Amino acid sequence: MADVGGGVMNVTFEPCCRNNWHIHHKQVQVLICVAGRGWYQEWGKAPVEMTPGTVIAIPAEVKHWHGAQKNSWFQHLTYHKDVQEGAGNEWCEPVDDDTYNALK
C-alpha cells in the first residue's frame, strides 16, 4: 500500500446518514465495508448495497455518494491510491431525501 495517500481511515455512519455527492479528483478512493449495511451509488447508475466484505474502487473523477441504510449502522475503511499532483475532493449537492428513501 505504498501508494496510499493520507493513510487508511475508519468511517462510521449512523442509520440514515449519508454524505453528499462528491468527486475525488486525481485519485482513486477504495471503500471496504467492515460492519453493518450501506449504499454506494455513482451518478446515473443504480445503487450498490454494501455489506461486510464488499470492496469498491471508485475511479478518479466519478461523482458518487455512500452512506448507511435506513435501519443499519454502516462502517467502512477507506483510503486513496494512485494519488496524483493536485488531488482533492469536490463536494456537491446532497442526496435528496426522495432518492434516498426509495432505496430498498
Give the location of each predicted region.
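A short glycine-rich, His/Asp/Glu-containing loop-to-beta-strand
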Residues: 1-21, 27
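Double-stranded beta-helix
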Residues: 3, 7, 65-104
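Conserved hydrophobic/aromatic positions in well-ordered beta-strands
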Residues: 9-11, 31, 77
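Short, surface-exposed charged micro-motifs
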Residues: 10, 55, 65
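Residue-identity detector for threonine
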Residues: 12, 51-54, 78, 99
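A short beta-strand-loop-beta hairpin characteristic of the jelly-roll/cupin
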Residues: 18, 23-54, 62
